[in-house]
């Protein structure tokens, strides 16, 4: 590291710079020990660390780093640099320390330093952003192969401080499926064949078949009742088992075969408490052939949250705030439960949230605890093809893939930063915005009280809303500086909204009326 100089007049740091320069030259020539240089650096720092003239002086920052590089307690030294706010607004503070950490193999910590600098808008900002992007590219290349070798291997997981992995990349998914294969074949309802689908029906053209067509899968006969959904690789059909209208299922037909989603469903069976299990979809069985896989799931007939939102859009109205808040509580509770057991959905959007209705009328009792009829009410999260099982990765793994779903790319994806739980919580924010405003969410940087910037929706809140609750939700979920567990944040947001609704009997009464009205409207359409 080289040190620059300027005129010594009125600059008491200048003689120290000259002495440090001479000491470094002597050290390289073998004329003194490193101890002499360390003492000189320490004395210089102690003399001027509280001198405001040098708080934003890059020469002084370089002296700090010369001292830091020779210390085993470098983290303590860096904390002191932060506490004394030396060059806090300059990108070189973060770039130099991140490079130092990267060389030591402390990649996760290095990434955190870059993120801190970016969140503070350190200048030159574009230089720091480019340095961070290049860092992610380097780490991605280094960890791509090694992270897959560590999947499911707890003994080796600690060897790698962190990995940056695309969880949806074909090679990643195939590696995971290979690792869990011994477990996969033991799952109840898992049926595999190395042959092509033996049925007479062409599964690729099922949508063209007439209603009531009978196809046989795994010894059972299914009466096709129509297409319920279609994606890039899969089609979902409504069907009756043995032509019995009381046994309705959803058949998800996918090519090429994709057993991963069934693994996610069985992990939900294992990890989610029985009292909440019906909120996350149920898979009965899967048939995996060499050309197709067919996933058999429970079928819910009451539409999706997207249908509810659309019912307001078509009449030019926005959803009532108390109903928005109710569905927000549902989603917060879902993600709190999922993330606490190490599961990420990865495709959290309104058309993957099915509506659930109880068989009997709702009562106010049990709203907080989701007991009685409330336990059968709410939402059901389905489509687990992009689900992430965190137990299969080292604990500190962070993700770099892009979901490429318009309107649902989280801030980290847009800014080329690693993410974890943000992929779900950003989806939640988009859905809440759609319920409140009838449009997708657009993000803008707004100045915060501490002089920095935070991500917030561009569209303003209406004055008569409970603005403090909505502002808190978007502020906390759109501005997470780390990829650490977010369950406490989700829980606190949920409880605040629950307490607000329960504080006024009129709100609870109105909510019941709106849910009853919604049920009549959707079921009759």
Curated annotation (Swiss-Prot):
Catalytic activity: L-seryl-[protein] + ATP = O-phospho-L-seryl-[protein] + ADP + H(+); L-threonyl-[protein] + ATP = O-phospho-L-threonyl-[protein] + ADP + H(+)
Enzyme class: transferase
CC terms in the record's Gene Ontology section: nucleus; outer kinetochore
Activity modulation: Autophosphorylated when the cells enters mitosis.
Major site of localization recorded for this protein: nucleus
Subcellular location: Nucleus; Chromosome, Centromere, Kinetochore
Keyword Transferase: yes
Motif Nuclear localization signal location, chain numbering: 50-57
Amino acids binding ATP: 228-236, 252
Gene Ontology biological process terms, A to Z: cell division; chromosome segregation; mitotic spindle assembly checkpoint signaling
GO molecular function: ATP binding; protein kinase activity; protein serine kinase activity; protein serine/threonine kinase activity
Gene3D superfamilies hit by this protein: 1.25.40.430, Transferase(Phosphotransferase) domain 1 (1.10.510.10)
Pfam families per the UniProt record, alphabetical: Mad3_BUB1_I, Pkinase
The keyword Acyltransferase appears for this protein: no
Maturation and modification: Ubiquitinated and degraded during mitotic exit. Upon spindle-assembly checkpoint activation it is hyperphosphorylated and its kinase activity toward CDC20 is stimulated.
EC numbers for this chain: 2.7.11.1
Keyword set, alphabetical order: Apoptosis, ATP-binding, Cell cycle, Cell division, Centromere, Chromosome, Chromosome partition, Kinase, Kinetochore, Mitosis, Nucleotide-binding, Nucleus, Serine/threonine-protein kinase, Transferase, Ubl conjugation
InterPro entries per UniProt: Bub1/Mad3, Kinase-like_dom_sf, Mad3/Bub1_I, Prot_kinase_dom, Ser/Thr_kinase_AS
Purpose: Serine/threonine-protein kinase that performs 2 crucial functions during mitosis: it is essential for spindle-assembly checkpoint signaling and for correct chromosome alignment. Has a key role in the assembly of checkpoint proteins at the kinetochore. Acts as a substrate for anaphase-promoting complex or cyclosome (APC/C). Necessary for ensuring proper chromosome segregation. Can regulate chromosome segregation in a kinetochore-independent manner.
Family from the record: Belongs to the protein kinase superfamily. Ser/Thr protein kinase family. BUB1 subfamily.
Record note on domains: BUB1 N-terminal domain directs kinetochore localization and binding to BUB3.
Subunit organization: Part of the mitotic checkpoint complex (MCC); interacts with CDC20-1, CDC20-2 and CDC20-5.
Protein name per the record: Mitotic checkpoint serine/threonine-protein kinase BUB1
